[in-house]
C-alpha cells in the first residue's frame, strides 16, 4: 500500500484513496501481511487518523502483520500512520519522525494596509476568525494558537509513546 506525497483530503494519499486499498489488501486471503510503502512529508492529521483507525481495525479483524517501510521520508502525519505497523523499517538516511504539530498562518494585515485595503470581519466570538491573515494578531490570539498547537503535539507524542514506547531510545 503506497502512501506517497502529502497526506490530505484532496491529495493522492487521502483516507478516501488509501482505505479501500487497505481493505482490499487485508481482505485478500492470499496476502499474509501488509506493507505500507511510505514516502511522505506528512500532512493533515485527521486524514492520518482515519487511515490509522482503518489499519488498526483491519489488523484486528484479519490478524495480519503490518510492516511500514519508510523510503526517503516518513514525517509528521506519515509517521503517525507508520505507528500502526507492527514493525517500522527505514534506511540509514531516511528522515523519520518530525513528531509534533505546526500551525503557520500568514499575517498580512500590515501589507494590505500599505495599499489602503482593509478587511472587515464579523464573527460570533472573539477568537472565531483568529486564523484570518488580514486582521491584526493580539496576544490573546497568539496564546490560543500556541495552546492548540501544544495540545495537538501532546496528543501526537502520547500516541508515539503508547505505540512505540518500548522501541524508543532515551
Where in this protein do the model-derived segments appear?
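Small-residue-centered hinge/linker elements
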Residues: 1-65, 73-163
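Short catalytic/ligand-gating loop segments at beta-alpha or beta-beta junctions
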Residues: 166-170
Amino acid at each position: 500500500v503506497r502512501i506517497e506525497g502529502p497526506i490530505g483530503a484532496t491529495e493522492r494519499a487521502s483516507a478516501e484513496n488509501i482505505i479501500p486499498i487497505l481493505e482490499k489488501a487485508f481482505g485478500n486471503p492470499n496476502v499474509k501481511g501488509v506493507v505500507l510503502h511510505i514516502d511522505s512529508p506528512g500532512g493533515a492529521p485527521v486524514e492520518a487518523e482515519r487511515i490509522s483507525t482503518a489499519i488498526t481495525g483491519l489488523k484486528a479483524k484479519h490478524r495480519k502483520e503490518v510492516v511500514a517501510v519508510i523510503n526517503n521520508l516518513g514525517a509528521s502525519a506519515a509517521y503517525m500512520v507508520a505507528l500502526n505497523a507492527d514493525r517500522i523499517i527505514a534506511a540509514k538516511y531516511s528522515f523519520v519522525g518530525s513528531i509534533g504539530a505546526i500551525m503557520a498562518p500568514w499575517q498580512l494585515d500590515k501589507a494590505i494596509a500599505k495599499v489602503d485595503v482593509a478587511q472587515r470581519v464579523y464573527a460570533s466570538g472573539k477568537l472565531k476568525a483568529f486564523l484570518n491573515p488580514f486582521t491584526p494578531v493580539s496576544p490573546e490570539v497568539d496564546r490560543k494558537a500556541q495552546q492548540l498547537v501544544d495540545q495537538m503535539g501532546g496528543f501526537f507524542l502520547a500516541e508515539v509513546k503508547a505505540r512505540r514506547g518500548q522501541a524508543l531510545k532515551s
